[in-house]
Amino acid sequence: DVMRNLLTRLRSGGLVALLGDRDISRSGVTVDFFGEPAAFPAGPAMLASLTDAPLFPVTMHYEGSRAIAVIQDQIQVPEFLPKRERVAHMTQQIAGAFEVGIDQHPEDWHMLQQIWLADRGPQ
């Protein structure tokens, strides 16, 4: 089971890299993304909340032929919120971190699927 493997890896201090702007399951969290409602995956925030693993959004861009990874500020688990709201709050922060990276290097961000809810067809 994929989720169990991810949880085990994180609880043992391992690293897990996930795409944070691709709601492949189409059951993600609705966030504000560049001023419009968009769907982002709940997985990164949910895993961090369940395991207390640090969550760092990473954005990438190119400088010439070199790929540059930028580790954004850590997203803290908001313990003061109920569990369901924690994931939504953290996912909104992930979206905000991606907005910063995309604003700085829009030419290096590529949408592989519809992210904004207004662009998606019927579920």
Where are these regions (language model features)?
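Non-catalytic C-terminal accessory region of glycerolipid acyltransferases
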Residues: V2-Q123
